[in-house]
């Protein structure tokens, strides 16, 4: 998985409002682009009740900054801490060379995930913010898959990074909310979900939660967005 991290950085999104860093997100490029050319998946609590939201990502070593003219928040999400914590930002920006990746379907992929539970996300922790460098403000968080509750469409995973001070885990994880959670299946990079936050108010035990890719797909379909293909409908080209 480590050799794929450089590729994953291409999809990493920072969300801002004015001078405030709101959190992270992940770019997704649909196969046919029938509705929009690109989408950002993020956590609903990252952008809800904010105005003048901007999307930032890197292309060819340069930062691209675009306005989030519209966004869709899950109708099942009401306030921070609740389940179904997903938002979608459609973007009409032409990024032809951006490779597509597959979005997981748990009923199809779970057995392989259990055999290879390593996960990784790329986000923008608040403690790592560098004003002059978008690239160096990115950071990675390696995790291991733990479990899923399909009734609330939520996955549980545990971070395995050894260099986070146990007393400061809540602080150091701030800003990762909304980042894409990726796994590797048969050498293919696959989006497993969207990072929500720590389990409870204290992250000291390392338990984290995220919305499943299945819920992202369902939300895209219900809101007339381009919908991620199911396994067998697209081949990863990372």
Report the location of each language-model feature.
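A glycine-centered beta-loop-beta connector
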Residues: 19, 32-38, 181-190
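C-terminal cap/linker of serine protease catalytic domains
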Residues: 1, 192-238
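Terminal helix/beta-alpha structural elements that buttress the NAD(P)+-binding lobe
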Residues: 153-165, 211, 217
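Short beta->alpha transition motifs characteristic of CBS
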Residues: 43-48, 123-125, 174, 192-201
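Catalytic nucleophile loop of clan PA
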Residues: 26, 167-195, 204-207
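Short Gly/Pro-enriched turn/cap motifs at secondary-structure boundaries
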Residues: 3, 16, 77-79, 169-172
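Protease-domain processing segments flanking chymotrypsin-fold serine proteases, especially trypsin-like
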Residues: 1-34, 218, 230-238
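Serine endopeptidase catalytic core focused on the charge-relay Asp
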Residues: 9, 13-22, 35-37, 46-161
């Amino acid at each position: 998985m480590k050799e794929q991290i450089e590729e994953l950085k291409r999809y990493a999104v920072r969300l801002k409002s004015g001078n405030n860093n709101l959190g992270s997100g992940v770019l997704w490029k649909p196969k046919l682009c029938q509705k929009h050319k690109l989408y950002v998946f993020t956590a609903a609590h990252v952008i809800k009740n904010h105005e003048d939201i901007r999307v930032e990502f890197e292309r060819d070593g340069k930062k691209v900054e675009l306005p989030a003219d519209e966004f869709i928040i899950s109708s099942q999400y009401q306030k921070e801490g609740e389940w179904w914590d997903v938002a979608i930002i459609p973007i009409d920006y032409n990024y032809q060379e951006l490779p597509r990746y597959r979005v997981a379907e748990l009923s199809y992929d779970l057995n392989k995930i259990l055999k290879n539970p390593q996960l990784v996300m790329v986000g923008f922790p608040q403690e790592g913010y560098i004003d002059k460098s978008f690239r160096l403000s990115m950071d990675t968080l390696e995790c291991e898959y733990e479990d899923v509750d399909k009734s609330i469409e939520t996955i549980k995973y545990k971070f395995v990074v050894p260099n986070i001070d146990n007393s400061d885990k809540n602080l150091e994880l701030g800003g990762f909310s909304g980042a894409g959670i990726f796994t590797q299946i048969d050498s293919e990079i696959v989006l497993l979900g969207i990072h929500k936050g720590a389990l409870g108010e204290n992250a000291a035990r390392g338990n984290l939660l995220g919305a499943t890719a299945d819920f992202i797909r369902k939300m895209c379909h219900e809101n007339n967005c381009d919908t991620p293909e199911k396994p067998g409908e697209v081949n990863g080209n990372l």
